[in-house]
Curated annotation (Swiss-Prot):
SMART domains: RPOLD (SM00662)
Naturally occurring in which organism (per UniProt): Cuscuta reflexa (Southern Asian dodder)
Domain notes: The N-terminal domain is essential for RNAP assembly and basal transcription, whereas the C-terminal domain is involved in interaction with transcriptional regulators and with upstream promoter elements.
The keyword Transcription is assigned to this record: yes
Region (Alpha C-terminal domain (alpha-CTD)): 262-335
InterPro entries, per database record: DNA-dir_RNA_pol_insert (IPR011262), DNA-dir_RNA_pol_RpoA/D/Rpb3 (IPR011263), DNA-dir_RpoA (IPR011773), RBP11-like (IPR036603), RNAP_asu_C (IPR011260), RNApol_insert_sf (IPR036643)
Name of this chain's protein: DNA-directed RNA polymerase subunit alpha
Phylogenetic lineage: Eukaryota, Viridiplantae, Streptophyta, Embryophyta, Tracheophyta
SUPFAM superfamilies per record: C-terminal domain of RNA polymerase alpha subunit, Insert subdomain of RNA polymerase alpha subunit, RBP11-like subunits of RNA polymerase
Length: 335
């Protein structure tokens, strides 16, 4: 356990981790402070951060299991102590860590007798088990046990429905949230005019509290970026019903207008989430610290190909968007 003395900055606003510990493989704890804040700011930030931590961070879970020769979820299999339903409930609790985009397949293939644990799951290279000791089933006889698994990365909660059922394949309610709990508290100082925000984070081990805080912060920033680029001339106040309709206005409209007025285009003011890239391309670029159009143009085609999960088709799609809307191209090689 790491614990630091709480010292309050009186000038620069800053986050600081004051306590960090690992209670188990599936329970991490971290306590952070943000200061100095003026009265009211701590509650505003604390509420937004807690919601982002609990609802916006992606996690990886098993969402579907395929058995051979099972008639329904509550059937039993000869040579296995647990029923199909109990095995599904055990698989629901398996904690995974990954940089997966979308879904992938995994499996378990083992011969009894013996215990089946998370360690026996055969995973693709980009997915790993957090706690290999998690129990799945007990094979009481020398039988061959094989099941297929579907793994998905998402956020929030997935609830199975009857429409999700297939022959021999069963969906699992999936809790994707890596953050198990988050609390915030506020301490006042300086004649009650300034505040310190305390934020406590518990995670399931797939992310550390510090990683969770960083991802939640990035997600909140992404939510507010559109407001930074909204132009007042696109807001039309209607006196009749006192509403403000927002006309459709994309970054491409902004570029066209700048060119028409012969004004210089600021590449660092255009963020990649404004470029309408597919989710896979956007996530790959973001994880490689490419956030703006200027960041993107500082990379060659060869640099982008080296990004994990990036393919030539993705680069071609980027080149198409850059050429169509900006008349720009990526350098073939920066060396």
């Amino acid at each position: 356990m790491v614990r630091e003395k709480v010292t309050v900055s009186t000038r620069t606003l800053q986050w600081k981790c004051v306590e960090s510990r690992t209670d188990s493989k599936r329970l991490y704890y971290g306590r952070f402070i943000l200061s100095p804040l003026t009265k009211g700011q701590a509650d505003t930030i604390g509420i937004a951060m807690r919601r982002a931590l609990l609802a916006e961070i992606e996690g990886t879970r098993i969402t579907r299991v395929k058995f051979a020769n099972t008639s329904h979820e509550y059937s039993t299999i000869a040579g296995i102590q647990e029923s199909v339903h109990e095995i599904l409930m055990n698989l629901k609790e398996i904690v995974l860590r990954s940089n997966l985009y979308g879904t992938c397949d995994a499996s378990i293939s083992i011969k009894g007798p013996g215990y089946v644990t998370a360690e026996d799951i055969i995973l693709p290279p980009h997915v790993e088990i957090v706690d290999s000791t998690q129990h799945i089933a007990w094979l009481t006889e020398p039988i061959n046990f094989f099941i297929g698994l579907k793994i998905e990365r998402n956020h929030g909660y997935f609830i199975k429905t009857h429409a999700n059922f297939e022959d021999g394949s069963y969906p699992i309610d999936a809790l994707f949230m890596p953050v198990r709990n988050a609390n915030h508290s506020i301490n006042s100082y300086g004649n009650e005019k300034q505040e310190i925000l305390f934020l406590e984070i518990w995670t399931n081990g797939s992310l550390t509290p510090k990683e969770a805080l960083h991802e939640a912060s990035r997600n909140l920033i992404d939510l507010f970026i559109p407001f930074l680029h909204m132009e007042e001339e696109n807001l039309h106040l209607e006196d009749a019903d006192h509403t403000i309709p927002l006309s459709p206005f994309t970054v491409y409209d902004k570029v066209a207008k700048l060119r028409k007025n012969k004004k210089k285009l600021s590449l660092e003011s255009i963020f990649i989430d404004q470029l309408e890239f597919p989710p896979k391309i956007y996530n790959c670029l973001k994880k490689s610290n490419i956030f703006t159009l200027l960041d993107l143009l500082n990379n060659s085609q060869e640099d982008l190909i080296k990004i994990e999960h990036f393919h030539l088709e993705d680069v071609k799609q980027i080149l198409g968007i850059l050429g169509k809307h900006f008349a720009l191209d990526l350098p073939k090689n920066l060396n």
